[in-house]
Every structure is written in C-alpha cells, then in structure tokens.
Amino acid sequence: MSSSFGKIFRVSTFGESHGGAVGVILDGCPPKLKVDINLIQNELDRRRPGQSDITTPRNEEDKIEILSGIKEGFTLGTPIAMLVRNKDQRPGDYDNLEQVFRPSHADGTYHLKYGIQASSGGGRASARETIGRVAAGAVAKQLLKTFCNTEILSWVKRIHDIESDINKEKISLKQIDSNIVRCPDEKVSTEMIERIKELKRQGDSCGGVIECLVRNVPSGLGMPVFDKLEADLAKALMSLPATKGFEIGSGFSGTYLKGSEHNDAFIKSDDISKLRTTSNNSGGIQGGISNGENIEMKIAFKPTATIGKEQKTVNAEGKEVLMKAKGRHDPCVLPRAVPMVDAMVALVLADHLLLNHAQCDLINK
Amino acid sequence: MSSSFGKIFRVSTFGESHGGAVGVILDGCPPKLKVDINLIQNELDRRRPGQSDITTPRNEEDKIEILSGIKEGFTLGTPIAMLVRNKDQRPGDYDNLEQVFRPSHADGTYHLKYGIQASSGGGRASARETIGRVAAGAVAKQLLKTFCNTEILSWVKRIHDIESDINKEKISLKQIDSNIVRCPDEKVSTEMIERIKELKRQGDSCGGVIECLVRNVPSGLGMPVFDKLEADLAKALMSLPATKGFEIGSGFSGTYLKGSEHNDAFIKSDDISKLRTTSNNSGGIQGGISNGENIEMKIAFKPTATIGKEQKTVNAEGKEVLMKAKGRHDPCVLPRAVPMVDAMVALVLADHLLLNHAQCDLINK
Amino acid sequence: MSSSFGKIFRVSTFGESHGGAVGVILDGCPPKLKVDINLIQNELDRRRPGQSDITTPRNEEDKIEILSGIKEGFTLGTPIAMLVRNKDQRPGDYDNLEQVFRPSHADGTYHLKYGIQASSGGGRASARETIGRVAAGAVAKQLLKTFCNTEILSWVKRIHDIESDINKEKISLKQIDSNIVRCPDEKVSTEMIERIKELKRQGDSCGGVIECLVRNVPSGLGMPVFDKLEADLAKALMSLPATKGFEIGSGFSGTYLKGSEHNDAFIKSDDISKLRTTSNNSGGIQGGISNGENIEMKIAFKPTATIGKEQKTVNAEGKEVLMKAKGRHDPCVLPRAVPMVDAMVALVLADHLLLNHAQCDLINK
Amino acid sequence: MSSSFGKIFRVSTFGESHGGAVGVILDGCPPKLKVDINLIQNELDRRRPGQSDITTPRNEEDKIEILSGIKEGFTLGTPIAMLVRNKDQRPGDYDNLEQVFRPSHADGTYHLKYGIQASSGGGRASARETIGRVAAGAVAKQLLKTFCNTEILSWVKRIHDIESDINKEKISLKQIDSNIVRCPDEKVSTEMIERIKELKRQGDSCGGVIECLVRNVPSGLGMPVFDKLEADLAKALMSLPATKGFEIGSGFSGTYLKGSEHNDAFIKSDDISKLRTTSNNSGGIQGGISNGENIEMKIAFKPTATIGKEQKTVNAEGKEVLMKAKGRHDPCVLPRAVPMVDAMVALVLADHLLLNHAQCDLINK
C-alpha cells in the first residue's frame, strides 16, 4: 500500500525513527546486474544525520546490511532486502512531545487518522524513513548507469532567499558534494551555510529549492495519460517529506510565455532516434514521454516544522500547550534531501525503463 | 497500465481523438450511491470544445452514454462504463501533420516510443482523452458530496500575465461559471478573454495558472510515505495535458519564510476531530494526511503547443519542414481545464476516502 | 479493481447481461502488432449463445466493435476498447426471479454484498461478462503466436460421467471444433451431446472437465513466490463462472505417486535453453516458472445452477418460495467455456511474456 | 512484484534459504489491533524444520524479530516488518548440486530464467521463503478473529494413499496438532507417520492432500469477475511450493452430479443476513462472494522433489550427471504445509474483509 512505490521495479520501505530498524525490499530488479555496495553506502552517507554542522546532530552511522537478493556483487533477480539499524535513539528527547502536536508536523494528522502513534519522534514521518528509498535508489542509479549511461544530479538551488546561478552544462557530482550545503556555487554556498547557522542559533529553520538534472535519458520512457513520466516524477518528489511544489522544465515561469516563445524547436537530424531541440522548456518530456533531452526539475522544500523556538500548540486533548522542541532536528532539510531527490528520480526512471522495455521493445528490436 | 488511475476507486480510460469513441470504466464505486446523470453531462459540457469564442471551434455535443453499472439512478457496485462518440472529426485537417512533429507536442515522442501513431490529431495526447476522466470525476464528486459534503472548486487564477485576486472565502461555482474564461473576478476576466482573443488572432497561444480549493475535507485522508495525499494530487494534476508545475499550500513562495513564520498554529478545541489552524500554509495536508482544513493547490499550464503561426520543425524522417497548424485547437487550454482539475482532484479524494475507510474505520467505529 | 486482470498486459471488463453493452479495455499491448479482427470475432462466435442445440437459445450475434487502439490492423500501443451490444434481451424472462435467489447462483450473494442488483438475469455473474475476456484473449493469442508461435488448445475432456481419451500429441483446433460439444473424440462426443440433450429435456443440467494444452511455451515465464505461473493460471481459470477445481500437470492423481516416480527426468541437451524432460508430471512449470515443456491443466465446471426443474428456495425477505427458471440458460456450460479457458490462459501468458521480457531480457540480450 | 500479495492488506516477502535472513513486510494492517507475538511465534513453530522425525533435520529456531509497526502489542497502522535469521545453514550440503538441476525442482527453471542462482539450496524456491507468509498470516488470523470470530483450520487429509475420514463439525486445532503429521484421525495418523518414515528410509518421498475449513466467514467477501474469492484463494494456495491442484466445495467430484443434485438449497430465515443452505457443495462461495457458510477447500501437494535416491539428471551445461541429494529435506511436505495453508487463507480473507469494508460498508452502515 502506501509504503510501496513503482510498478515492476518496486520498493517497499518500513521502519519507525525510533524502532529497531528501517529498511527496504526492492523487487523486480533485473538479474545479473553488477551492484557496488560501496555506492549504496555512499548515498546513505550523503543523507545521514550528523554529517556536518548544518544538519541534525543525531549521530547514526547508517551502515547498510544486505539480507538477500545479491550474491557476490550481482543481483539474483529476487527481492533485495536492505536494513539499517537505529542506534542513536533518544526517545526521551521527545517525551514532552508524545501527546503534543508540533505545528505543521505529522503528529496531529497521524493521531487523527490512526488514533495511535509511534513511541516518540516522527515515526514513519521522520526523515529516517527515506533510508530505504536512498538505498534502493542507489541500485536504480547503477541500473540506469549500466544500461543507458544515465546520470542524475541534484543540488541546492536556493536556501531561504539566497539563490545560486548554476551553469548546468558543466555541473558535476564532485562540485555538488564540494561543500556541506550541496550548492555547486562556491561563493553562494558560503552565504547559504551562514544563513542556516544563523537561523539555527535563533531556534528557527528555513527551506528552499532543489534542482535536478538528468543526462542521457533514453527517449520513449513514460506513457500517455495517467502514468506520464512527469506525473510519476511529481508524485515521487512530492512524496518526500517537506515538499510543497514541483516544476518540470519551464514550470510556473513558462506560463508567462506565448506558445511561439515556449515551443521547443526540433533540430533536423539524420537519425530520428537522436532528435534534439534548440530549447528545453519541455524539460525533456513531451506528452508524458521522454524526448531524449535532459530532464530538468525544481522542487520546493518548506522550512523544517520542528524548531527550537517556543510555540503555542495543542495536545491530544485539544488543550493549549507551550512547546519548545528538544529533539535533534535539521535547521534546513535541503542538504540531506539532495540524495533523496536523486533516489526518487532514479526509482521512477528505472521503473519506466523496464516498463518501456516490456511493452515497446518486444517488436522493435 | 498507463490509462488506469486509483487503487480501489479506479478509472480506466480509452479512445483516440479521431477514433470511434472515447470513454471510461469506473470500477470500485460503492453500491446504492444516487447518481444524477445530468451532473455528469454538466461537467462534460463545461469541458466540451466549441463552448465559447475562446475555445477550439471543434463542435462536439459530447453526449454521455452509460453502458453499465447504474440502474434507475443508483450504482450497482459494478463497473460503470461511460462512452462519448466522436462526431465532428476532420482527420483531413491534420493530414499535413501526419508525419510532421509539432514542436512541444506529443507527436514526436509517441513516434519515438511506439513507432506508430493514431491516424491524425493528438490520439491519446488529445484533450479528448480527458472526457473519461471528467465523467468519472463527476461520479466521484457526487460520492464526496453525499458522504462528506465535500466541495471542489477550481478557477482560472492567471492567464498569461493577467492575474486575479480572489477572495477564497466567498468563491462559488456560480461565480466561476459566470464567464467563459472561468475566472471569478469579473473585471479581470474581461481582460483575460481579450488577451486570449488577441493571441488567437495572432495565431499564437498562452498559458496560466489554475487554482483549486477543496472545502469540507474529512481529516485522515492520505497515507504516510509514498501515497501521501499531496503526492497523489500532484500525480493526478501533472497527468493532465500541458501541466508544468504543481503547488500545495504555500508552494514555492513558502520557501522564502522561516519555520516560525510558516508553521500553522493549531487552535485549541474541545473536539479534537475538528482541530483547525490559524493559517493554512500546509494547504490542508500535513505529513501526507488531510488535517481538516481546506486543501489549496495551484497548477501551471503551459501555452498550447499547436499554434497557427508558421513554425520550422522536422518530419518523421528527421528532415526540416515548415508547418502551420490547420487543425482546430484552443488558443488557451485553461478555461476547459477547470473541470479537468476538478475531476482529477475528486478521483484522488474518493479513492483515499475508501482507502481510509478500509484501513482505519474498521476498528474506530 | 475486481474487473481488471493482469499486471502490464491488463484487461478491464464491464457490462451487465441485460444492460446496454458488454466490453473490455485492453491496456499495455505492444504497438505495431498485426491483429486480425476476424480472429477476434471467431473466438466470440465460439462462445456465443445460440450456436447449437446444446447451448442457451438466447440469440446474440455478438458482433465486435473496436473503438480504439487499432489502426489499419495494427495496434497503436494505446488501450484497445472493444464493445458488444446486448440485443436479444428479455428481462421479462427473469421477472419472477428478481427477488428470488436461485440456489447455488450469485443472486443471493450479490444481494447480501451490494444490497442492490442488476435489473434481471445474472448481471455481472452472467456468462455474458466473459465476452470481454474472450475478445481480449483473442488479441493475446495473436501476440503469443506472433512472438513465440505459442498455441493454446482447450477441449471438453468429460461431460457428467462420460470421459474421453485424447491423444494430446495429435490434437488440433479443427478436431476440437468438429462437433458442438468440443470434445475431439468423435464417438464419445456423440454420447456427450445425447446426455446434455437428455438432461435438458428433464429440466436438469450437468458439468464436467475441460482440459487445456499449451504448446511452444517459452521457458522462463512466471516468477517465484506469489506470482508463480501456475498460481496465476489457477486464479485466471477459477475466476471463470462455475469452476470448482484446478489441476496443473499430475494434479490430484500425482499425489498417489512417490517422489522417485513423480519426478520428471531431464534429457541431456547441447542447448540448455531447449531442455526437455522424459515425463511431464510438472505440467510444464517448475518452481512457478515454465520449463519449455507443454503446459497441461484440467478445470472442473459444476452443473449449471439455473435449471428448469422446480426448486424450493427463498426470496429477498428470506421467505420460502417455489421457483422454476424461465430464462434461457445452458444445460451445460462446457462447450461454450472452451474459448473462455483459451482466453484466460492467453491473458496470463501474454502478461508473463511481457513481465519476463521487462525484467530478464534487458541484460541477457 | 512477484514477492508481494494482496491489494490493501499486502505482504512482501524476501530472503534466500541460505542468505542472511528471511522476512516480510505487512502493509495496510488496521491500526490499534491487539497482536499477540506469541501467536505469531507459535505459527512459525508449527512450520519450522526439525520439529519431528518426519520433517527435515535442518534445525532452525526461527525466532521472530519485529522491526516496526507494532508498539506495546498494538499495531500502528504502519508497515509491520518481521525478520528471521538463517542459522543452521550448511551451504556445503548442496555443493554437489550447484550446477546440477534436481529433477522437478526449481533449479533448472531459475537458471533458465535468471542465468544466475542463489549460492546453494533452493534460494527463493525453498520452503524457508514461507516464513514471511506464515508470520504475516498469523497477524491476519488475529485480525479475522478480532473482527469476525473467523477460525481457519487446515489438516492433512491424505498422505500417499492413506486417507482419513474427518468429522468436520467437531474438528479443532488441538486435535490437528495432537500428532506430528497433523491428521486429526488418531489411528490413520499413525499409519501416515509410518508410511513417511518408510519412504524416508528408502530415500524416497510422498505427497498428499490438505483440507481447509473456515468457520464464521462473514457473507459478502469477494468480488465478481476476476477477483472472485475462490480465484484469489486458488492463487494463494497454488503459490505454495509443491501444490498441483485446488478444489473449492464439491471440486472435481461435484462434476459427476446433476444440477438438481448439486444445487445448495437455501433455508428460509427471518434474518436474510444469516441465510444458510442445506448442503454446501458451493464451499461457502457463490458467484465469487462468500455466502456465510463454511469455506471448504482441498489442496494437492506433490511428493517432495529432492530425494535421497540416486537419479539421472543434467547439469547447467546440459550434460548428463548422476545425483543423490545430501541436503536436508522433508520426505513429505504436508505436516509443515498445514500452517502455510492457514496463513495464505488468512491473508486472502483479511484483504477481502478490508476491500469489502471499503466499497460496501460506507453506505450500508
């Protein structure tokens, strides 16, 4: 149900933030795919807490354990189960929150829906849940790299009102990871880091925008009508905690253009399968199907709901209470959300790669 | 596959724009629901072509035929099949397009994916495909009205750069439908209509933003992790033709706020199930689950790709050609997209209503 | 929901027995597949009522109408919608049944579940619902024939206690269709026809066993654990009206053998992909995956529940009533069930062919 | 994909027989359900190897570890992840099998499909995979017991040719578990145990039939057309290792009856929701929907493929080899298959309970 994603390359995650473990089952992965476990661990390291001064101080090593589906570095075609134990749990930190609803957090809605909640912390609403996504996404990335040389790059575009101006042509993973905020603009990244630290000192938080670029996308991925590639990407990214908006290609700003300005002109080509366009307002997708251009997206992340400042709120009886979060939390989720965006995009593309292969490559090739 | 949507309240659409018919099967609808066929026809009338000077002149009555699942105005609990015949087909209009890829349209990607295309017109990429969605959505609306008194209202917020300022408290369907552009701001709507007519005269097109408001949403709809309510809404709306962006609640602009500014404070309440917040930056959803506040969304629609102006493009051999669309098309899709937005939102909410009932109302009640 | 079948080669059927029409949407079919409409009509003719003295006299031409997804004899890769109008409806025939539950029929359970029923006749429980299955199955058969030269043959093995002894090596469609009971044993078929006629005269009915043989099954179809090929075949066939039992390979009788007797020995082969076995107790499937041998199944069909004899039963108030069915019904469903079995088997195999291609043929080829 | 089962009460299993662990995620379980972990462990003990002289000597404690979704004995409504470590692994036992295909086992088909296999033992085809099913089924059993007082009882009906005659009215779990073969007929069970021991001594194996009875089934579970209750039960049970046949109610033997003999007459009743029938050839299901009578099924299990006797077979190069299994295996799977049957039936019924509640209890109650 709600903890599964994908049609035939399909992940199912589990785990509460302060329970025994979090993890994922990845089913439907092709057999005999070479998988480098270090690359999985590396993505988890990019998303792990405690990685820098501007993330939550919760200190988790987040060491991945592979329980099934991989043998001597190759996939078996059977479910790949991956597990990370929760270690640095401090349920006590949230004791004062147990029956208090943090404003704009999931505490209240979980209580209204289920009438019961995980002991403490965010339960399934915690960012720890994304460990399973990131681990499975790291396998998806390797699948895409192996078959299509596809490269997924996400970075912090804006923090609060500090915006970077990135040359997408040249951007690389190395640049993105060169600083702790994951904005590949050296100068601007320093300002961003300062802003986050300042807000943290104030017991406050901020949000921003992550941009994602996918290179070497095969044309033909995606489908008409409901399972359009941009629709599945939108769902995937809007399922990440704290997201409030999604844009593909020209997004909202494209709506200020006329059709004659917005249309992406095709460039003549001897090889129709390698058709390119002069501009990319479409963001690499037309009619729900990739056209071979880069996929380009932007995702809005709201400021972290859990803040140190005192706030008025209510408890599970509806009575007014004052609260001040003691739990460890990120003053800004974006630096750690970068690998989550990568992962969700990889999961969508891997699923659509297999789906397209299933339906359209039986006859053509 | 790609033409089905929903988990247990599930629609499957079919039909090409110039084929025999378009339609939908709606499966999983509760039995004994009173359904007014006139309300279904009314929604189709709101989306039908030829309804005004600013829509495509293709003249289709779009008369709904119910083939199954309803008896004397009540649902049977079995699949509801609904059909609309294509009548005013002029495949000849698109003869010059058959092997020509309209820029930023689905022609090229369909060809790359399938290697074969519907005779003419947009095939499944045509807005005619949405007839099935709108018909099924009209049933979903009645289900939501019957069980929760839920009301879904969408309207044109902006056309090109002409923006309206709407008082959401007072807005009504009557106001929205009081003018042909479906912007409930009388003065601004006149400007919008003028702009669309002007661009039409120029053989050009424009886009804009539709806003959607849902009142009386029961709390508890939606689920953690992947099937968050906002994620399913994002997918539903980004699956509509011509969409480029989606926002829930504060959207992209909310990312300029600090956490202390963005958080929606709860108001104390004796009845916890009727909890409200002082602001609604969350847009009615927290942690993927509705909190009982209004759901508020914005959707970006790009300018129509098919324009009358001459454009350079390529044909299926990759050779450069000049084209000038003769087919009938909308200079701006937004007025007709309003009922499509309503429909997709209704389908998502109806499905989540049943899903929540399945999992969470067995014990509670 | 319950009216859809298949994961990526997916059918959704609709229609009540005495409503406007019955039909099907087939989604996920590969594009550019050559489809002969006559072969679809031919399968419908094999299942249509009124085809002989031993079937229901309801006279329906069951002429197929293709609404979408096929252009000039080739699939577009988009949903194929197919429709058959109900013509020879006589709702009056069932007037005396409207609130009476036929013993062992779906009348009672539909009433208990939905609290409302189709006007008359069996609604979705009628054999007319299978029209959509047979039409879609005829497309699946052509897909399987085109890609793998796969041939599906079903026939009547036993009627009541009259059993045939068939040489499976030589059996052909022509033989099967050479008589109206569809038993390819000329002598025994005459006895079967006599038995059915005799029971019909008595206002009674009978059941029996259909056998199914699939030749040229590619190895590798099916999956471990839940979606084993035999499990999906069992579900497909047990979803046909009136089925009470399913066997693959040695079935129940194989349980009387010892392992050393039951095991199918492999025959050495230079080409491992063409591995064969000396016996076929496995029925062509091992561990849920096809091994390249013929798939062999048997399906038990109970005697028709609707009979002309007077029976004691109850009405919707639970009161005892006497009933004697006036509606037109089959004294034995098996002759018309043969094409239904073919269709369901074809749908399962086509779906698994695409699924296997998706997961396992990306790397191998 | 293939390792998931259920629509909204959904399990996903993972794990190879000789990997790190096997387990399951159960998603969609209602919140606030009281779950007794001992009852889960108890079901695992019923299926664990090494429990008696007539099962495999592999000695696994199979101690369940709950990783998420349960807090202080109550479900949270979030995914319940359960894990069992593999301890008594002896991959060496199967060394001589690594590239040898055991006749009638999954070795050959896994190799043909995936081109790669788990290190040794059966991988996903091993009975160890069913641990996840049994653990999740034990939760489903508690759900059914809590809401409907439903009781699922399975037992060994026949071993090889030794058949028991059971009085279904009186049968109890205590009787079933009173002997190691799980046949509640004391005298016959002794013969069965002797037969199994004798065949084990000969290095041979046997199969048989398990019968399943479900009491207190609410009417209205199941759906028309494809997701008929008996169809989902057939799939569930035919997905268990070694199954070759499935019967509901009268099964194959019912096909020897006339309609007038086979029909189950309704008994008049003041309360229509408690309608009963004089006989139960339907096996508790009519038209795909439960009628409130007991559900009755029979499942055929073939003799274990892995035997100690020397057999001729082939290796992965297609060359002929002689083999004699050294690995520990069951001479007869039925005693341990009893809790597997219980589990699969529970999973199907729990899913259909929620599905029926979702669609049909919104209006009625």
Swiss-Prot record, chains A, B, C, D:
PANTHER family membership: CHORISMATE SYNTHASE
Summary of subunit composition and partner proteins: Homotetramer.
Disulphide linkage map: none
Catalytic activity: 5-O-(1-carboxyvinyl)-3-phosphoshikimate = chorismate + phosphate
Protein name listed in UniProt: Chorismate synthase
Cofactor(s) annotated in UniProt: FMNH2
PROSITE patterns documented for this protein: CHORISMATE_SYNTHASE_1, CHORISMATE_SYNTHASE_2
Binding site for FMN: R124, A125, S126, G287, K302, P303, T304, A305, T306, R328
Family affiliation: Belongs to the chorismate synthase family.
Pathway: Metabolic intermediate biosynthesis; chorismate biosynthesis; chorismate from D-erythrose 4-phosphate and phosphoenolpyruvate: step 7/7
EC number: 4.2.3.5
Stated role: This reaction introduces a second double bond into the aromatic ring system.
Keywords: Amino-acid biosynthesis, Aromatic amino acid biosynthesis, FAD, Flavoprotein, FMN, Lyase, NADP
Amino acids binding NADP(+): R47
GO MF, one example: FMN binding
